[in-house]
């Protein structure tokens, strides 16, 4: 392999893409790797939140698609590897395959959650699909989708080695409102109000400098709105360190919830989208949970009653989920208060997260497995 077109689109996928690029260069010395960045598009440009935000920038996304299709035609890579970001990336992978170029997609589209009618189209668009979760290949034809293990599993100690051994600061709360600007504006104000008046300290790891600037603006608005604001440390990066240090976290749905899970950090998962998107989501999505640790837990405890009883604040799952109208200041505050005041609850949450993440492990190096599917 001499040329690899490697396309992510959002920062969460770009993290894996950088590792894939590094491993490809180790396994195939001299390979040239290009991505969206070489054609003038950054993750900040591409990461758009919400139906209306996409619609408002539809001409930009059409330009991205035309530019990348032209790049495939002119540069003629030996393989195209797309990472997550399925709305754009699966179209580009299908285009590459139609030109006789090997196309591999990393991160399974969530067909187990909604719109299973896409499965034949996905199978026709790709040569291989690399999955991070053990239950995903069963939705596709034999030999097409492969469980490679989750890359995060290799970066954290196995669950049995750390179960119940967290030494987090009992008053430190990590707040992660998401990496997109729309998420920060829509979610962070609720998280900040939830900690107003609590005896705690907060850390907010931003995905990048642009996100940090937006977070700092929201924090200043919050401080100006009243008293009782605990200390807040806003930093670029450092999410994993924050999860290791914190007693608990409030995290917007996404890759950060998995990092919290692998760190065994007691977590309340929060998310809220616009009314139109929520309307369609309620009619299309076929699963009870959005947190991947909870989904893996449920798949591997099928037939059990995971309710945990009325006395279990986590409802029998590894993570508490507060979505849409449940994502209120009152509910988030209660969840954080429960975690910082109850050592036993934190231990229960950590143990369940350890068990759930152990199920995402497999023998060998997931990134090397992905690279080998490219040839």
What is each of the regions a protein language model found here?
Residues 1-375:
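Nucleotide-activated sugar donor-binding and catalytic core shared by glycosyltransferases
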């Amino acid at each position: 392999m001499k040329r690899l077109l490697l396309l992510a689109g959002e920062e969460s996928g770009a993290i894996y893409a950088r590792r894939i690029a590094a491993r490809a260069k180790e396994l195939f010395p001299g390979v040239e790797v290009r991505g969206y960045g070489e054609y003038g598009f950054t993750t900040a440009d591409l990461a758009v939140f919400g139906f209306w935000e996409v619609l408002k920038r539809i001409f930009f996304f059409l330009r991205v698609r035309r530019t990348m299709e032209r790049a495939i035609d002119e540069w003629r890579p030996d393989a195209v590897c797309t990472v997550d970001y399925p709305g754009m990336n699966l179209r580009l992978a299908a285009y590459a395959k139609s030109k006789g170029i090997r196309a591999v997609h990393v991160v399974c589209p969530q067909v187990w959650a909604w719109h299973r009618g896409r499965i034949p189209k996905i199978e026709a668009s790709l040569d291989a699909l690399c999955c991070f979760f053990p239950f995903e290949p069963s939705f596709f034809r034999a030999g097409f989708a492969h469980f490679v293990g989750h890359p995060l599993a290799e970066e954290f100690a196995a669950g049995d080695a750390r179960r119940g051994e967290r030494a987090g600061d009992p008053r430190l709360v990590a707040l992660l409102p998401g990496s997109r600007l729309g998420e920060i504006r829509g979610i962070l104000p609720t998280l900040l109000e939830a900690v107003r008046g609590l005896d705690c300290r907060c850390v907010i790891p931003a995905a990048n400098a642009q996100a940090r600037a937006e977070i700092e603006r929201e924090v200043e608005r919050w401080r100006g709105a009243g008293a009782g604001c605990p200390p807040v440390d806003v930093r670029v990066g450092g999410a994993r360190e924050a999860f290791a240090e914190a007693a608990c976290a409030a995290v917007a749905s996404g890759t950060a919830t998995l990092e919290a899970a692998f760190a065994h950090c007691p977590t309340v998962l929060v998310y809220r989208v616009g009314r139109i998107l929520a309307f369609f989501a309620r009619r299309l999505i076929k699963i009870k949970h959005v947190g991947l640790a909870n989904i893996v837990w449920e798949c591997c405890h099928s037939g059990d009653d995971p309710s945990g009883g009325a006395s279990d604040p986590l409802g029998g799952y590894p993570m508490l989920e507060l979505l849409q109208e449940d994502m209120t200041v009152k509910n988030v505050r209660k969840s954080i208060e429960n975690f910082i005041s109850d050592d036993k609850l934190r231990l229960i949450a950590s143990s369940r997260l350890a068990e759930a993440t152990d199920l995402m492990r497999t023998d060998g190096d997931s990134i090397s497995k992905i690279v080998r599917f490219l040839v």
